Amino acid sequence: MRLHFCSLLLLYCIVFVSSFLTTDALACLPDQIQALIQFKNEFESDGCNRSDYLNGVQCDNTTGAVTKLQLPSGCFTGTLKPNSSLFELHQLRYLNLSHNNFTSSSLPSEFSNLTRLEVLSLASSSFTGQVPSSISNLILLTHLNLSHNELTGSFPPVRNLTKLSFLDLSYNQFSGAIPFDLLPTLPFLSYLDLKKNHLTGSIDVPNSSSSSKLVRLSLGFNQFEGKIIEPISKLINLNHLELASLNISHPIDLRVFAPLKSLLVFDIRQNRLLPASLSSDSEFPLSLISLILIQCDIIEFPNIFKTLQNLEHIDISNNLIKGKVPEWFWKLPRLSIANLVNNSLTGFEGSSEVLLNSSVQLLDFAYNSMTGAFPTPPLGSIYLSAWNNSFTGNIPLSICNRSSLIVLDLSYNKFTGPIPQCLSNLKVVNLRKNSLEGSIPDEFHSGAKTQTLDVGYNRLTGKLPKSLLNCSSLRFLSVDNNRIEDTFPFWLKALPNLHVLTLRSNRFFGHLSPPDRGPLAFPELRILELSDNSFTGSLPPNFFVNWKASSPKINEDGRIYMGDYKNAYYIYEDTMDLQYKGLFMEQGKVLTFYSTIDFSGNKLEGQIPESIGLLKELIALNLSNNAFTGHIPMSLANVTELESLDLSRNQLSGNIPRELGSLSFLAYISVAHNQLKGEIPQGPQFSGQAESSFEGNVGLCGLPLQGSCVAPPTKYPKEEDEEEEEDEVIEWKAVFFGYWPGLLLGLVMAHVIASFKPKWFVKILGPAKGKQVDPVRLFMNLDSRWDSFNNKDTVEEEVI
């Protein structure tokens, strides 16, 4: 009966799992399915559902054995142990565990059990330690990828892997020399990537290397010495060669690479080059389509480009090139990407239309010394960046005719005149820090593609254009440091993707609270900069309710920085000026999880809303230079990520909440020039602050202020108790000796009067009507009336 039950349970499990299997996985035997489930259960896999996991499973239709396993990226977290059920899948031919988090895991030697493996990819999976020697048993491997881990030790033992065609060991910490017989023992090797390690020594390439199948070689960012360049020049089948930052003491003569007739991509950045090898008569592979010469100490524009008519991509950024860009450069027939950033170029040879007929699509000549009018951009422009130059005059209207243009960055120049009224087709418009005038064009049509609009630090006037509501993809809007006069744009909260809104240093006015006194409730806003305007009024208690972006989350598109628009050949990242920890600074890159609010320099009043405590991911809060009153909200203690807090120059009262000491990331706090009192809380968050952070509060005391909190002198508790007891004894003695004799005399008199009943007595109390009079009650009655009589006299005296 027990055996029958177990069989039914196993059958149920198989049927249940099979319901999630793909067509390729349906052929799997029960024991293989069980091993797969056990393997999954060895790790935390909350971000991985069963169907995602099993989609990467493939079994042989004949044997039912698992032959392919490809885990989804970011699916597993945990340690890959030697006894893992993974190593029971002996028929595996393809195994890809890349982009998972196998924390604290070394590479188990049990990988050698999988002797049928042909493809093994463990890239970006947090593996550490040395590569086990047993990996040399995987003699059928054709593809081995161990890149982007923290593997150490000498070069892995791969000599026996004679079928290898792909070997990627980049971005690790391997040290020592490359085996001198590596290439002869791996005759099929076509892809070898060793960059970003600690490899040393020279490179030995045998004379027979002309028959080598190696077509892609990356050796950059290591610590080689001795012979490197000459041996590589023997690998005549190379089409992709990367030799960045080789740490060679002498300049490299590019003419050495002339034998590489098939070379297409050559990256030799961060090396010193022999100037003569950059001349137009130098022999160089004419097949080149991409040449990367970043940071090579080049001082003159390389004439070698004249002969390289197949070039599509040129990068000579971060050099020392002076003078003008020659006119012939724009006539290279296939040139589509030109990066001239960070040189000392002063302009362009030829007319202002020298670029017009160029084939260039991505053009970046930012951070140079170019002056004069801006040239007419190429007809096929996609990306155009000229920030940080000294161009003058108007922005050319020819930009409006560039239908392919996506990114336009002309910031940090000296442009004047109006903003062209044709920018809604662009994803990125950055015109920051020029001298542009007029208003922001109200020409953003329905379906506008704009994601970033930065026109800060100009001389713009008018109001914010309501047509911005058509920019449903707008993420970043900055109009800071202009002369815009308008009320707060509550209507912008209809934009579902707005992350950054910067209105600082304009002439905005009116209330910040919505007309219905409800929460502001921007759905995705993370940075709100409203400082140095004329906003007035108070903020309702629920002002910060429903700010969804204050909660931690991972970007679905994988972006790290705001405005991080990436292409294979360019990156654009939004920049902004932020006041942080008391300092005003420009942030060249702003992380997507960064969250800050700055309302400083306005005329806001009333209490700071307690709902501020709901913004748990807020990093910086600046409410200084306003007229806020009341206490510092205790709910600020819930803002656990807070690093910078500035509440200075308001009218806040009460004590500084001790709960703020629980904010472990709080590095800067200023409450200067308020009406606070009491002792400054002691703790690491407060003790490290400057005295100026608390000055201007008459009632505050304690470190870091000079004066300590001194209480009035008090007596010792024992003496106080003894004196209190003595006073109580004296008081009771006075009561006893003063009250009881009088009471006794009163009782005697009452007894006498009650016995004889004189006429005056009867007039006061009235006839007894045959009742016996109680002497005590009689005395109390007389005493009460006597008090009434005395009180009457007192009232009369007051009237007089």
UniProtKB/Swiss-Prot annotation:
One of its GO terms (cellular component) is plasma membrane. LRR repeats lie at residues 89-113, 115-138, 139-161, 162-185, 187-212, 214-235, 236-259, 260-281, 285-307, 308-332, 334-357, 358-381, 382-401, 402-423, 424-446, 448-471, 472-494, 495-519, 522-546, 591-615, 616-639, 640-663, 665-688. Keywords: Cell membrane, Glycoprotein, Leucine-rich repeat, Membrane, Receptor, Repeat, Signal, Transmembrane, Transmembrane helix. Belongs to the RLP family. InterPro entries: Leu-rich_rpt, Leu-rich_rpt_typical-subtyp, LRR_dom_sf. It is found in: Cell membrane. Its main location: membrane. Residues 20-733 are extracellular. The gene is RLP26. It holds the Pfam family LRR_8. Glycans are attached at residues 49, 61, 83, 96, 101, 113, 145, 160, 207, 247, 342, 357, 388, 401, 470, 622, 638. It comes from Arabidopsis thaliana. Residues 755-800 are cytoplasmic. It comes from the Eukaryota. The keyword Calcium does not apply. Residues 1-19 form the signal peptide. PANTHER family: LRR RECEPTOR-LIKE SERINE_THREONINE-PROTEIN KINASE FLS2 (PTHR48052:SF8), UNNAMED PRODUCT (PTHR48052). It is a single-pass type I membrane protein. The chain crosses the membrane at residues 734-754. This is Receptor like protein 26.
